Amino acid sequence: MIKSEVLSGSASKTVGNSISNGTTVSTQNQGGKQNLIRQQQQQQQQQQQQQQQQQQQQLKHRTALQNYHFASTSEEILKKYSKYPASMSLHIFETHYRFNNSQDSQVIPKDSPMIKDFMKHVLKEQIPVEMCELIKDFAIRPYDGCIILQVYDHRNMVKTAVLQNRSTSSPSKDQDKKQQMVVSKPRTYRTLLRPTSLSIYYDLLYHTDSALHRFTDYLSLQMESEILTATNRELNLSVPLNPYNYDHLRPEPEPSGDMSQNSDEEIDQVKFQHRDAVEQPRRKIHQDEMVLHKSSEYEELMLLLSNKHKRPDDCSDKRLVVVSTSALPGSSLTGTSNTSTGTAAATPTPTSTTASAASQSSKQTTADGASTTDTKGKKGDKANGTSANQASASPTSVHPPIPTIPQNSVRATGQFMRLRLIEEIRKKRELEKLQQEAKIQAQANAIQSDSVPPSQQLAPQNTINSPVVTEPTKRSSPAAQNQPAPKRAKKETKKQLQAKAQAQAKAQAQAKAKVQTETPGPTPVQGQNSLSGPSVVNGSNVTSTANTPTMNNQSSLQQPSQASQPQIGSLNNNQQSQSQQQQQKNPQQTLQQQQQQQIFQNSLTPEEQKVYKQIQQNMATLAMMGQSGVTPTGQQLTPQQKQQAIQQAKNLQQQLFQRFPLYFQRMKQLQLIHQKRRLQQQQQQQQQQQQQQASNSSGGNQNNSSNQAAPQTQQFNQALPSTSEQSKPVTTSPEVKKKRTYQKKKNAPAN
């Protein structure tokens, strides 16, 4: 029993201890939570107090800014900085001026124009522009962008009392005695110099020029802020409201009595009458360009030969080659030079022979590498030589000289090259019209001279060692001189053809009338046995050996009749047309080579040109090896090696096409254009030949009469002695085809 009670008592004690411990832990937990809550509340209160303080400070700052008054006038700025030292000082004396009144400062005389100008700026309260650099160099301190100038006037001295401290001589006494002294000082006053727009500009220039660093955005903004604070103080940075979006904020105006009565009537009325709207048609792009030509051929050639596709590394010596054959001055000049050399050969003067030799030597031009300036210079030499020939051949000609076109050796390339070329083409066409009119006039004069009787045409030939010149050549020389030989045969207008036909009809009628009245007979020519030089027929200097056969009508040229003159004129025209065709070939070939060279230079760079030439040279050697079967060293090739060489040449050709497609495309376009031109020239030549044949068909009766007179001339030629035939070189003339009227006969050989 005792043990059980003891055990129960101990158990109750342990239970009581555990209960007391649990209560103490719970009370501690509750106290910790309360402390945390209190701390959080205190923190929240502190944050609220801080926010309130910040708001109050912001409100105070706003009110301070709103109530802050910027010093804008000169008096306000001077009052604001009255306790600060002045920016600079000026001392005025009786005889001179001085800045800062130091030993280093120079004495400025009273008559100096500089001080007069400075005093004008002081009166205007402006900073002198000339002082902008000095202000920065001497570190003059500005105040709100202005300069405070303190003036000391030594002319008006003011007496002021100054306290002076003096110590006693006895060491026992430490008291200082103060004594007043009267000192005269100059009168002083301050003034303000404000910046001007020009001084601000010079200030900015000084900063940007002298600064080694870049003009950064920070520096620009800082300068802008200083300028704004110095010039415009009260800034309104609020965004203006849109009146259309804020109609409700607009105050309503108080209506007056008169306006209230008429308000309803004026609502529907239009106060301002505007003019009627007009719709203007829009212009197309590039409508204002000066386009005088309409041919697409010209456009294609200009695009091919234009300098827009040139590489930047190309040299500037390459010039533009003009392609238009009908518009070039070289076409007419070369034609006239060649024809005039033929006519000038009829005269026996030595100057004509030398000039013709010079013109023949100038015709030879190199096939490759000929630049445009060289060819133009040679054409100019030809034109000069032919003008000298014309002057020596016909000194008594009455016809006015045909105006020539000045050729520029160098053509300027640039943006306005196309307009310049168009203007030149227009001028050349006008000159061609003038030349055509001169040609028609010369032909009319030649037809009128055909009506002269044969007795006046023949002149005694007593000179020895001189060529025989027939009268038809003399008559045709002025016409040939004034008649230009264009490079490209052109269509004649209907009016010109009608005028020609009428003139020929009149000449034929006169010839028929004179044939009926006069009987043609053989007239001996004087001086026939003394011939030793070459004979000139129809304006062409043609020499031949004694073995060459001669034409039948050529032997009868020494006794011309009126019936055979139209036929000779037609032969002369045909010979001139043939000479024109021969003259056209060489210039066209050189021009085509120039165009190809220009395209080659414009399409390829110098490095590409070298590569192209190397590949082309290799391809040519391989092709020659494949065709001949011999290497350049002289070794023979087998058939398989020949095929390999040909295949390699084809591969190189394909490689050229692949590497330079632009060049081959342009060359193909150029060939197509030249083919079109050749077809056009052939068509025009055929049309001209048909017109000439139609005009010559009307003179068939005259040709029959000339055929009847042929046996008489043959008998006359047989009657001549054989010595004259041996001494005279036989002349030949080119064969000309005629319809049913022309018969070829050979002279009987002399025994």
Curated annotation (Swiss-Prot):
Residues 1-42, 164-183, 328-411, 445-597, 681-751 are annotated as: Disordered. Component of the SAGA complex. It is found in: Nucleus. Induction: Expression is down-regulated by flucytosine and upon adherence to polystyrene. GO terms for biological process: regulation of transcription by RNA polymerase II. Residues 331-374, 496-516, 554-597, 681-715 have a biased composition (Low complexity). The keyword Signal does not apply. GO terms for molecular function: transcription coregulator activity. Component of the transcription regulatory histone acetylation (HAT) complex SAGA. SAGA is involved in RNA polymerase II-dependent transcriptional regulation of approximately 10% of yeast genes. At the promoters, SAGA is required for recruitment of the basal transcription machinery. It influences RNA polymerase II transcriptional activity through different activities such as TBP interaction and promoter selectivity, interaction with transcription activators, and chromatin modification through histone acetylation and deubiquitination. It comes from Candida albicans (strain SC5314 / ATCC MYA-2876). It holds the Pfam family Spt20_SEP. Keywords: Nucleus, Transcription, Transcription regulation, Virulence. Disruption phenotype: Impairs proper nucleus dividing and distribution to the dividing cells. Leads to hypersensitivity to amphotericin B, fluconazole and caspofunginreduced; and to reduced virulence in the C.elegans and the G.mellonella infection models. The gene is SPT20. Residues 7-38, 387-397, 445-468, 475-484, 517-553, 716-734 have a biased composition (Polar residues). Residues 737-751 have a biased composition (Basic residues). GO terms for cellular component: nucleus; SAGA complex. Belongs to the SPT20 family. PANTHER family: TRANSCRIPTION FACTOR SPT20 HOMOLOG. This is Transcription factor SPT20.
